[in-house]
Amino acid sequence: MANQPRPKVKKSRALGIALTPKAVKYFEARPYPPGEHGRGRKQNSDYKVRLLEKQRLRAQYDLSERQLVRAYERASKTNMKTGEALVIELERRLDALVLRSGIARTIYQARQMVVHGHIQVNGQKVDKPSFRVRPDDVVQVRERSKEKTLFTIAREGGFAPDGETPRYLQVNLKALAFRLDREPNRKEIPVICDEQLVVEYYAR
């Protein structure tokens, strides 16, 4: 794993975002922010606000700090706004798109599917979660893995995301396959983040 183990609900509460379905249920049961029914919290400094936003982005893609820094460096060299380019860069990771497609339930599960060799791209096994998928690449579960329980659940829509599948993906869950039709644009990516604060954190 990219990060040290920590209870996902506790981590979700600290960051103010639901990282797993269990955390979603927790937030539904306790819609108030941490501290509202306990001792008050100090007002955060600008640095802490930026740090929190950076940590939130890291958590949603389950990245190490080094991985996020590398993605930021690549994004800063594009002709796009650095923040938008950063999120798009991360969204093209293989594990992120396995999650978006509905083949996996969480980013953690998606990462394990890739690492354990269950996923192929254009007919070739890829076991690196950081692999960057390109437009027109076809991603699917390997034939030898399709009868595993997890993939049987996925095939029946058990892991399908709430709402619409992102428009940049063409998904066939029955075949446990999807294609990246085009590069995502930031507004389509279901990530909770003010990426400009992340840029400000690294540019300080």
From Swiss-Prot:
UniProt entry tagged with the keyword Ribosomal protein: yes
GO biological process, one term: translation
Keyword field contains Cytoplasm: no
Keywords: Ribonucleoprotein, Ribosomal protein, RNA-binding, rRNA-binding
Domain S4 RNA-binding stretches: 92-153
Gene3D superfamilies: Ribosomal Protein S4 Delta 41, Chain A, domain 1, RNA-binding S4 domain
Matching HAMAP family: Ribosomal_uS4_B (MF_01306_B)
Subunit structure: Part of the 30S ribosomal subunit. Contacts protein S5. The interaction surface between S4 and S5 is involved in control of translational fidelity.
Family assignment from sequence similarity: Belongs to the universal ribosomal protein uS4 family.
Protein task: One of the primary rRNA binding proteins, it binds directly to 16S rRNA where it nucleates assembly of the body of the 30S subunit. With S5 and S12 plays an important role in translational accuracy.
Name used for this protein in its record: Small ribosomal subunit protein uS4
Originating species: Streptomyces coelicolor (strain ATCC BAA-471 / A3(2) / M145)
